[in-house]
Amino acid sequence: LWRRSAYLTLRLPARRAAVAAGLVVALAYAVLSGFAIPAQRTLYMLAVVAIAIWRGRQSAATTVLAWALFWVVLLDPWAVMAPGFWLSFGAIGLIMLITVGRIGRVHWLTDWLRVQWAITLGLIPLLLVFFQQIPMLSPFANAIAIPLISLVVVPLTLLAVIPLFDFILPLAHEVLSFVMTILHALSDFPQAVWQQHTPPLWTILAAICGILWMLLPGSLAGGFFAGFPARWLGVVALLPVFWVLPAQPKSGELWLTILDAGQGLAVVARTAHHTVLFDTGPGFGDTDSGSRIVVPFLRGEGIRKLDAMVVSHADTDHSGG
């Protein structure tokens, strides 16, 4: 619409007007979302692009991402402690790696498959570090959830903020409920989620190197062995994250771990062949420290079963988990 007006275009080029309007919308969205890390990342990336356009300069995609990373860390240093920080920037970095600078044009479906492949494979180390889980059906979930939420739910919800359009909010709710129903159905599939221990640091670093090697330029049409030579070697570097267990007590050693269970107690005692849990921590209304703290710790350490559990007394801060 801006381009159709000679008066407006002469005073402010349409490209500058578009990026300025986009920046305002991104800022409003970030405010509404509580400045969540993905919203901050998008806002700062768009701000870098806007500055480059207004100054008549080109800005590389990696430079835009680097500046966004810098501003997020500068303004919110504690953001690096959140899994969303690493997953958000990691996903965008992977998308850039698999799409930016590639020679030749490909079909949109091929491009989408490449992006899904990169994200699914590339986020494995982070998912294992933070959650000790890998959603095996995430490509299918993303294929359904991302378009519906991005193109339907979010626009309808933002439009409903305007009082005259609040009547469309139930429609957004229905679409979101439909998406959640599908996601719950996918999560009920057997082996929908791979669960394991937290890999040692060296295996994480090896996996990252292996994944980057596998994502080097190649051809989907020509198979995994096409393109950059020996990309299959990346699989070798990835495998240790699944096989190598964390450090375990040696014979004759006793390891005691006091878990941060709030106003309560949960202690894990381990030897080379046995694991005992002393107290389970408190309960938290609909949830408890057992599912939130104790079980993730045991899973992360590669402990599949307890040899014994001792509850010192029946107070909820010791037995609520």
Task: Please place each PLM-identified region on the residue numbering.
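Membrane-interface amphipathic/re-entrant loop segments adjacent to transmembrane helices
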Residues: 128-144, 148, 152-208, 215
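Hydrophobic alpha-helical transmembrane segments in multi-pass membrane proteins
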Residues: 1-139, 196-251
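Metallo-beta-lactamase
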Residues: 306-317
